[in-house]
Amino acid sequence: MKKLVIIIGILAIVLTVAFIFWRNEVKSKSPEEGFDYVEGDTRIHVYYNRPYKKGRVIFAPDGLVPFGKVWRTGANEATYIETNKVLLIKGQELQPGKYSIWTIPNAERWQVIFNADYPSWGINFNGEANHDPSADVVKVDVPVSTTENEIEQFTISIEKTGDEMELIFLWDKTVVAVPFVVTGQ
């Protein structure tokens, strides 16, 4: 019995060390990023992982992020946004709270989805997006634009232009901007 306990203990230690090594290895390829947009009493926090292009085709029918399929909008864990104010996104209200962000990229337009469920990992065991459509709160379609400069690492930012703001996704030569307004609530 004592040998069994020792073997189980050693196995647990080995598995823990292997998991920590694997997690650090994965994170080094797509480091995590979090940022806060703060203005007055408005606070918006975004958390995501930033994969690199590394010479790959990113957005295409057979690209790393295929057209028409749900994408976790980053790598590793699910991307999320947290707000303490109501955000009016193309006429739809996103209440204060924490939401995962999912996208369905296409050549001309993207569907951007804010979802009340935020799983710890962005894909399931089948390698598919860990997205639960029944928890979708806001869905908007936005146009795709391009830039001449190639963006090597996936980037999300928030920019203010007048009274409006934009949640911006940049990668490769693709730029997607989701316009929104922070309401006073």
Region locations from a protein language model:
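Short extracytoplasmic
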Residues: V38-P66
